[in-house]
């Protein structure tokens, strides 16, 4: 034993001074004093448990004592009757054994390899004992889990990383994966559980027993993130689920991790052998796999960047020439050649390194240098951690802990130790660079590109200072990192093949560089990640965005401008094809060309395939709406033109739907016989509301009324003849069905037919004569108001002319001014009471006083009031042109008409852009004050005077 340095002797005196009065200090041997001066962990432990000192004196730690751990622990667990007792005994046993290991290590009673063996064996003993005790307890509670043949099913635990390799460090956490063999259910318990439930509950209890801090501390920090799907995956998986995951989705890093996987406890059972056989092909390839080098180089680059980013100086694990680089060197040969060289299929590093040397895979002498460096670094790491039982690999900055490490490493002082350490790490670094290479000599552009890869692949934390996000404020930077982290977690729940992962890893750095260079980075990122989540299993779409940078830029621009567009793309990724050509993306179809475009589009689909026809209609609508929205966002279409395009689109789709419904009805029943000697179908569709008024928005529904001119005695001419009027009723029902059927692309439009005569209680389809009679004799004033905004959007010219005449006759009927004024005003007040603003501290652009509905009521009132004298007022069905007519016919002065038109278009523009943002139609209470004052003044003038 090396004598204590003056500084450590002085520290021992400090320790002695703070020992309890009844502590047997006089009985302490020089070895005990040295270890207590070296390790605060040992000092605190033996103060709490003085009896442990006696055991150390009576039975000095030995290299092979790990073989007794299981028996020693079982003796302690004999009397345990509940989980609290189990947790206490596990913690006390772990602490006592760790004191013995720290003692032996500090005094060099055992070799470094033997220390690693003891630490790993202790962890395995504690894990297996806890599992077995809890398994028995769970079986007592719920019965024994069995397969279909009644054979009991065990919980198998894979120890990963250093635990699996038998190289656990002093204060390590433990990486575990839980598995059970076959599906089934419990038998013999008070309550039956399926095996998945049983093992999940057992796994949760096991983690709690090991990980939960109590007054006695904890056993080990348990990390389950290496399991399939990480934190978002099931806690325990069946063998079948494990095999499916690793065959279909296993990633490079999971393959590397599985090299060290070892089954805890019984390694010779049937199920253990089955699990090992299942995993071996995933880990060790039959062919020589040189792609491993680049993958490991990428991983090493990621770690090097993490060291730089976090300022991890003096890190003996992650730093240049550290423990991780030795592990990488060994893994390169295991993964490249392990499938062909069984000697390389070992979990522990040092035996594998010896096999590498025997196979002459490294230059002469390099394996010996790596072995020496590994043992040096692992001893230094374990000594460092045993000072405070603290998980750290960063060398201390304070003089006391430096003196402790110099003593533990048998050097005169810290400077000597530092020189030895530098020499060892330089040797490792040289071998690593010669084998794997490095990524540190990068140009500024390469470094920036690396930062984007880092941002995607390294799961950065909030305090990581990446130049890529330097321009964002703290809040936005945190938002970006959180969005990326959430997206990665979501990906873990998805079944993504290796090709999909590869394309995604190519795409994401480019996408992040485009998004994060924007000042509003969190906004488009939050909107695009749901889209990406939806397409990650469809590699074609990922490749489209990866291979066409222009499409990616357009996607970001559109999603940043409108969550509505982002949502539409997320729901219907087929629309991504529309992003490929910017010349067409921002150029909507000409208003008079929608019908022809749709006809051409439907030619791609078999006419007899109703399902594909429905799908094609919906896809056409979505693609055209995307073009309209893109032009809208780009500012090339004013709001009135946007509505024109949306209205023309709706009419084209209505035309196609009627044709489709007509064809289906005629195929079934034939056509009504009154059509034999005439052109057309004797059918018309009247558009009301926004459709009738050329004011459709992106999510507007269609207000429709159906008319026909079929005489009462007519039948159809098909084999299954039906009454002609019944034919038109079923035709209208079929049209409604085609609009509202929900396919994978959603519905076409919501259709509302309640504006028909007698509303929901009336016939769905009426004759033109019945419609005229209802309007003349039964309709309410509000129904005549609605007629102002009605026009035929599909139908025979003769029937259209008949409707126009009915509308003109009704609207030009003389009305008593005061009565009309009262009825219109009362209807508006009733609407406001029923539909008024639910947010009193906001202004509802449509429903509140001074809003859009008031303007509509003013124009409708004035048409009904003055059309008897000025029939030209009935010409148009949209508010803007009605206001023009009112001015041209000297009913409203031009200044007021212009002011109301300005207010109307301004408010509609605002409502329209709120819809693009998926925002409700209410704004700050002071908004649009000038426009509202104008509307209120006109309301007062026309409807209150």
Swiss-Prot record:
GO terms assigned for molecular function: [glutamate-ammonia-ligase] adenylyltransferase activity; [glutamine synthetase]-adenylyl-L-tyrosine phosphorylase activity; ATP binding; magnesium ion binding
Class in the EC hierarchy, top level: transferase
Gene assigned in the entry: glnE
Catalytic activity annotation: [glutamine synthetase]-O(4)-(5'-adenylyl)-L-tyrosine + phosphate = [glutamine synthetase]-L-tyrosine + ADP; [glutamine synthetase]-L-tyrosine + ATP = [glutamine synthetase]-O(4)-(5'-adenylyl)-L-tyrosine + diphosphate
Residue numbers spanned by region Adenylyl transferase: 449-945
NCBIfam families: PRK11072.1
HAMAP family per the UniProt record, alphabetical: GlnE (MF_00802)
One Pfam family of this chain: GlnE
Cofactors that this protein relies on: Mg(2+)
Task performed by this protein: Involved in the regulation of glutamine synthetase GlnA, a key enzyme in the process to assimilate ammonia. When cellular nitrogen levels are high, the C-terminal adenylyl transferase (AT) inactivates GlnA by covalent transfer of an adenylyl group from ATP to specific tyrosine residue of GlnA, thus reducing its activity. Conversely, when nitrogen levels are low, the N-terminal adenylyl removase (AR) activates GlnA by removing the adenylyl group by phosphorolysis, increasing its activity.
Organism, as annotated: Klebsiella pneumoniae (strain 342)
Enzyme Commission code(s) on record: 2.7.7.89, 2.7.7.42
Organism domain of life: Bacteria
Keyword Zinc-finger: no
Family statement drawn from the similarity comment of this UniProt entry: Belongs to the GlnE family.
UniProt keyword annotation of Acetylation present: no
GO CC terms: cytosol
Key words, A-Z: ATP-binding, Magnesium, Multifunctional enzyme, Nucleotide-binding, Nucleotidyltransferase, Transferase
Name used for this protein in its record: Bifunctional glutamine synthetase adenylyltransferase/adenylyl-removing enzyme
Annotated region described as Adenylyl removase, given as residue ranges: 1-440
Swiss-Prot/TrEMBL GO biological process terms: regulation of glutamine family amino acid metabolic process
